[in-house]
Amino acid sequence: MKTGIKGVRRASAVIVTASAILAGGVLTTPAHAAAPPKPSITAKGGFVMNNGSGKTLFTKSADTRRSTGSTTKIMTARVVLGQRNLNLDSKVTVQKAYSDYIVRNTASSARLIVGDKVTVRQLLYGLMLPSGCDAAYALADKFGKGSTRAARVKNFIGQMNTTAKNLNLKNTHFDSFDGIGNGKNYSTPRDLTKLASNTMKYSTFRTVVKTKSTKQKVTTKSGGYRYMSWSNTNGLLGTYRGAIGVKTGSGPEAKYCLVFAATRNGKTVIGTVLTSSSAANRTTDAKKLMDYGFKVA
């Protein structure tokens, strides 16, 4: 049997070509895809992390102290949920001081009615959904220690700052129970994200902040009942796939803030934007950061 010169050349060519391919790396593992570009946000500060691993995914002035607006109420809830022997079904009687506070400060309200009896659990809904400063006041009055309302409120704010210290939130300080501060109510995107991540460990908090709307039955002064309806100010719920919370904030100095979280395919990203330029832009900023976070987490 003859092996022609052409056959030998063809065989040699195949060997040479295969060697060249291997040498060129064509058959080796493909290179990693290019990293997605970091998003541009209108907010002056932003931070995102993988909630499971704690890995930082995005920063923009993440450690610059800024006014927090009603995102302060995450700490209000955290202090309540951290109370020993907490009874979420214990009742609180709504005081006139709470409604007077709303009127005096033109503050966001859960529309609590003087004389009604509401549970601590219901106050948490009133705190986190409509961002009720009256609910925040009621909780501070309930869980602060002291013989006067002023003393109890001062003590509760002290508990907020102690909790911040215990959570190693080095750039955070509170001088109010609701975010209507006196110049010393501040935090950072990183610190607020860490606070939210810690507070999300409480199942009650997780349930509350993912709720779009609720109707709560409360006891009236006369012993009857009425229903209180509250809707969540967080526009991410129902508009961003996997959104699970957590809290909006706004104010003259704070502008527009949002602490946010979402879960997709078993992975949760959580973050904060502070001092955005509008309610719409803070939501857009958050969506951009979560989209990016899920790509790089």
Please provide the spans of the model-predicted regions.
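Secretory targeting and sorting signals
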Residues: M1-A33
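Short alpha-helical segments used as structural interaction elements across diverse proteins
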Residues: K6-G7, S70, A279
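Active-site-adjacent loops and short helices of periplasmic peptidoglycan-processing enzymes
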Residues: H32-R190
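Penicillin-recognizing serine hydrolase domain
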Residues: A34-G45, G144-A297
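Hydrophobic alpha-helical segments, especially transmembrane helices
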Residues: R10-A11, I74, R264, T268
